[in-house]
Amino acid sequence: MDKLNKITVPASQKLRQLQKMVHDIKNNEGGIMNKIKKLKVKAPPSVPRRDYASESPADEEEQWSDDFDSDYENPDEHSDSEMYVMPAEENADDSYEPPPVEQETRPVHPALPFARGEYIDNRSSQRHSPPFSKTLPSKPSWPSEKARLTSTLPALTALQKPQVPPKPKGLLEDEADYVVPVEDNDENYIHPTESSSPPPEKAPMVNRSTKPNSSTPASPPGTASGRNSGAWETKSPPPAAPSPLPRAGKKPTTPLKTTPVASQQNASSVCEEKPIPAERHRGSSHRQEAVQSPVFPPAQKQIHQKPIPLPRFTEGGNPTVDGPLPSFSSNSTISEQEAGVLCKPWYAGACDRKSAEEALHRSNKDGSFLIRKSSGHDSKQPYTLVVFFNKRVYNIPVRFIEATKQYALGRKKNGEEYFGSVAEIIRNHQHSPLVLIDSQNNTKDSTRLKYAVKVS
């Protein structure tokens, strides 16, 4: 029984504890549900209470109904009318009345006195009426001043015109127009015109004298000594007269006489060649250049003509037959010199394939070789390297690359070596082995170039 009591007592206590827990849970659940219900009821009106506190709670419930839009229209209209009506009435009277008054005072036209350069204090009393009446004469006042300036200018020109008449001695009357702007330069030009006035007078005299004197070349020392003296003076100061003698006068060998006699002989020599240019020498210096100019082209043509026949005749024999032969030989020698092949013991020249192979078979040594010209005479493949190895003869083409002016062995391939001359190819493969490919048997061999063979 004691055991049963011990077992039943805790069981009853546990039941009581469970009942309390259930009771507490129910109470708690009831409180939570009430709180949730309260939140659901109070949540919507909480917002309008803060924004619209003046309205009653009954109105707040109505605001969330279908008439919600109508409730917001009324406060907006009242607020707009109250906000914009008051400042418009008060500010309109204060802000917009003074500006028109200031604008009326501004058109007093204060700019007119400033345009004249006068001060406002001097014309303070005459602000309104006089400026309008005086602006009209101010406009014609400007042309009046210009007219005065123009009137002064002709007066100056009239004063300067008497200075001009001594100047036209130089036969230039148009310079009077240019004298007005620059006064100092005119005075500078007066002196040279007076000193230079005698030569223009002599110039027409020389032109007139040349015509009758052309028929009488012996008259200058006797009859018209004055006129001819002027002509000699014009020729003597410029030493350019003897300059054409070495150019056109290469044939005659008599320029070593005295100066007056040489000048006479020069004139006579020119007259003997062409009588017309003799008069031109006396008339103007520009015509002398025109006379000398045709003398030069034949001299230049002779220079070009001389080297052309020289190589043809020096060769001797028939020029037509012997001419082209040295041209081919010269071209071949130039190409051979560039390739570094000329006068080499391993160079066979224009040797055909059969004779080259026979010479190598006769040597019967591995590594024997020679260089011959290709049988096709192709500029891209000018030479052929012939090598003997293992009782076989290999003909390897030597290509010439025109773009870089270099040489290469065999067909074009990637990673091939380029050389500046054929001699460099031979020197390279005398130290490093050369790969020999047999296209028939698909075999590869290598050997160095050891023995140079000559074709007998």
From Swiss-Prot:
Ranges for domain SH2: 346-453
Superkingdom, taxonomy of origin: Eukaryota
Compositional bias segments (type: Acidic residues): 57-74, 173-187
Any single Gene Ontology cellular-component annotation: plasma membrane
Protein's UniProt keywords contain Signal: no
Post-translational modification: Following BCR activation, phosphorylated on tyrosine residues by SYK and LYN. When phosphorylated, serves as a scaffold to assemble downstream targets of antigen activation, including PLCG1, VAV1, GRB2 and NCK1. Phosphorylation of Tyr-84, Tyr-178 and Tyr-189 facilitates PLCG1 binding. Phosphorylation of Tyr-96 facilitates BTK binding. Phosphorylation of Tyr-72 facilitates VAV1 and NCK1 binding. Phosphorylation is required for both Ca(2+) and MAPK signaling pathways.
GO biological process: B cell differentiation; B cell receptor signaling pathway; cell surface receptor protein tyrosine kinase signaling pathway; humoral immune response; inflammatory response; intracellular signal transduction; positive regulation of gene expression
Modified residues (Phosphotyrosine): 72, 84, 96, 178, 189
Compositional bias per record (Low complexity), positions renumbered to this chain: 212-226, 251-260
Location relative to the cell: Cytoplasm; Cell membrane
Effect of mutating residue 72 to F: Significant phosphorylation reduction
GO molecular function per UniProt: enzyme binding; lipid binding; molecular condensate scaffold activity; phospholipase binding; protein kinase binding; protein tyrosine kinase binding; SH2 domain binding; signaling adaptor activity
UniProt feature, compositional bias: Pro residues: 236-245
Illness the protein is tied to: Agammaglobulinemia 4, autosomal recessive: A primary immunodeficiency characterized by profoundly low or absent serum antibodies and low or absent circulating B-cells due to an early block of B-cell development. Affected individuals develop severe infections in the first years of life.
Biological role: Functions as a central linker protein, downstream of the B-cell receptor (BCR), bridging the SYK kinase to a multitude of signaling pathways and regulating biological outcomes of B-cell function and development. Plays a role in the activation of ERK/EPHB2, MAP kinase p38 and JNK. Modulates AP1 activation. Important for the activation of NF-kappa-B and NFAT. Plays an important role in BCR-mediated PLCG1 and PLCG2 activation and Ca(2+) mobilization and is required for trafficking of the BCR to late endosomes.
Oligomer and partners: Associates with PLCG1, VAV1 and NCK1 in a B-cell antigen receptor-dependent fashion. Interacts with VAV3, PLCG2 and GRB2. Interacts through its SH2 domain with CD79A. Interacts (via SH2 domain) with SYK; phosphorylated and activated by SYK. Interacts (via SH2 domain) with SCIMP; this interaction is dependent on phosphorylation of SCIMP 'Tyr-131'.
Protein name: B-cell linker protein
